[in-house]
Amino acid sequence: MARAFPLERVRNIGIAAHIDAGKTTCTERILFYSGVVHKMGEVHDGAAVTDWMAQERERGITITAAAISTTWNDHRINIIDTPGHVDFTIEVERSMRVLDGVIAVFCAVGGVQPQSETVWRQADRYSVPRMVFVNKMDRTGADFLKVHGQIKNRLKANAIPIQLPIGAEGDLSGIIDLVKNKAFIYKDDLGKDIEETEIPDHMKELAAEWRAKLMECVAETDEELIEVFLETEELSEAQLASGIREGVLNHGLVPLLCGSAFKNKGVQLLLDAVVDYLPAPVDVPPIQGLLPNGKEAVRPSDDNAPFSALAFKVMADPYGKLTFVRMYSGVLEKGSYVLNSTKNEKERISRLIILKADDREEVDALRAGDLGAVLGLKNTTTGDTLCTTDDPIVLETLYIPEPVISVAVEPKTKGDMEKLSKALLSLAEEDPTFRVSTDPETSQTVIAGMGELHLEILVDRMLREFKVEANIGAPQVSYRETIRASSKGEGKFARQTGGKGQYGHVVIEMEPGEPGSGFEFVNKIVGGIVPKEYIKPAESGMRETCESGVIAGYPLIDVKVTMVDGSYHDVDSSEMAFKIAGSMAFKDGVKKCNPVLLEPMMKVEVEIPEDFLGSIIGDLSSRRGQVEGQSIDDGLSKVQSKVPLAEMFGYATQLRSMTQGRGIFSMEFSHYEEVPRNVAEAIISKNQGNS
């Protein structure tokens, strides 16, 4: 079956902003005017189509990134309504990565908020072309040109209005289109009866001023246009439109539009602009990946290229496990077998779905450029590549770091234990940086993640989405142990309690292993000093001790153990005796090998206004941080540092208080480093006191 829309007429866009800028209402209106829904849903009524989880409808916020397809002016538009709550995990960035363009929604009253700065920088990181919709122009205090100034100054964007509001607050009656040089007056409350007319007399001077600025801004992005503009001081409507599109695609400019989604004004013009100015899949660089031989390759947006797609979200759903995919090349057909090249496992495609929020349209195939969902994938998780078995490729994927912080979690009522297990399993499937395990000593359930904020949000989701109330322990840092010297260790387990005794004797040589090697065991027993059947139990005893630690109860890493000697008894020796002897030898060896404690170091990047630079650097130093670099750009300071995770608890609150809410930071795991002796002694004595 041929594709319904040529690739040139496909738009994959995200609608992103800070909380309460009106993203979801904006998406609702887009769906209403494009005919996907026939009745408008209001977020505050709990009826919004994209807020399809019951918990979202209760709270009037968007928790998950809902993917919806619609059409406008004979174009397919796939929309992701992203959560406004931006935390520091990788989820939001992944959403950004599968988009080709973004509508950044700003509130006409609140303007640029700290959170909108975060969203903007994430779009910068993935070089996503964007346009701005200044929403809530009907609100008291709305000021379109003030928001334009904030975007230019605080976000350093070459933003230029392509529209102007006619009136504001309660008097918002229409919009001036500076490209067409026409006014659009809204005649009814539903926003369907729109009159295209001449610009009102009282707005002509302002419109002429901003149209001249628009022409100048557009001309500067293109050599041919600048020649025309210098000669005639005028650009035609077609030249303006093509210049704006070119400027958006090459990140040279950001068009500003305005309106009020809630009052049904400006949404159709916004849809026109999506079609006119945001990129199709063929307008952005082809996705890069690695072939099995390690060479780099690209996959062009083309139905005839080998199939490749990226799983960007996994969600539990009444219909089963939904895996959202972005199709980059080729065709994916229902019932086919594909390769998950990230895990090197085959998967069967049971059903293919295009989502229209709680409405689902089953399709026989997804094609290059599509956003859709797959049912039936058993082993695919967020960030995995799906491709053809004949032409495998692993698409650019994000490094998924190991968790560095853990907390014990238990349900408030014992009857909720099964619900808690299901909730944790479901959350872990969605987020690969979230891990669940059981502490072998206490039998407590332990959850681990990338930081305090990450775990707070997941625990909040357990309550909201799965109705499980949980008690959470204090955050624990995942320390590690290792050794710095070489030595011998010996363990002899001999017990006689009448009848058959127990006897095992193990001698080992211990030395530091290669970084990242974990636990390495070498058997050098010769001549049957210790029978073969006792070697494995001895190794098993060492491994278990290695996992539970020796000096402070943390896993021991990067150690090489060679079993060189030992003895046994024909009658009294057993596998259990050698397991215990192996553990004893390991502990003996570690104590002689200068054991040390390691702690996770975090790569911390702080962005603050220049005025706060001194106090922020001082605060990082007081947290045992090492400042590695700093830069100042237009009054915004960036500080790069490495700080122990143990010193970063509560930092988000502290940073907000030190910078009046204007500072933001990102934090990710860097490496393990030796803990200073005085700090290590305190940790060891505390843990030994608890054991």
Curated annotation (Swiss-Prot):
**Domain of life of the organism in this record?**
Bacteria
Instruction: Note the InterPro entries from the entry.
Output: EFG_II, EFG_III, EFG_III/V, EFG_IV, EFG_V, EFG_V-like, EFTu-like_2, G_TR_CS
Keyword field contains Nuclease: no
Output the Gene Ontology terms for molecular function.
GTP binding; GTPase activity; translation elongation factor activity
Q: Which Pfam families match?
A: EFG_C, EFG_III, EFG_IV, GTP_EFTU, GTP_EFTU_D2
Q: Which UniProt keywords apply?
A: Cytoplasm, Elongation factor, GTP-binding, Nucleotide-binding, Protein biosynthesis
Tell me the compartments it is located in: Cytoplasm
Gene3D superfamilies the UniProt entry points to: 3.30.230.10, 3.30.70.240, Elongation Factor G (Translational Gtpase), domain 3, P-loop containing nucleotide triphosphate hydrolases, Translation factors
Q: What are the coiled-coil residue ranges?
A: none
One cellular component (GO) term of this entry: cytoplasm
**What processes in GO biological process is this protein linked to?**
ribosome disassembly
Name the major location: cytoplasm
Residues given in the record as GTP binding sites: 17-24, 81-85, 135-138
Q: Which stretches make up the tr-type G domain? A: 8-282
What PROSITE patterns does the entry give?
A: G_TR_1, G_TR_2
Q: Which SMART domains match?
A: EFG_C, EFG_IV
As for family, the record states:
Belongs to the TRAFAC class translation factor GTPase superfamily. Classic translation factor GTPase family. EF-G/EF-2 subfamily.
What is known about what this protein does?
Catalyzes the GTP-dependent ribosomal translocation step during translation elongation. During this step, the ribosome changes from the pre-translocational (PRE) to the post-translocational (POST) state as the newly formed A-site-bound peptidyl-tRNA and P-site-bound deacylated tRNA move to the P and E sites, respectively. Catalyzes the coordinated movement of the two tRNA molecules, the mRNA and conformational changes in the ribosome.
This protein is called: Elongation factor G
The organism encoding this protein is: Prochlorococcus marinus (strain MIT 9303)
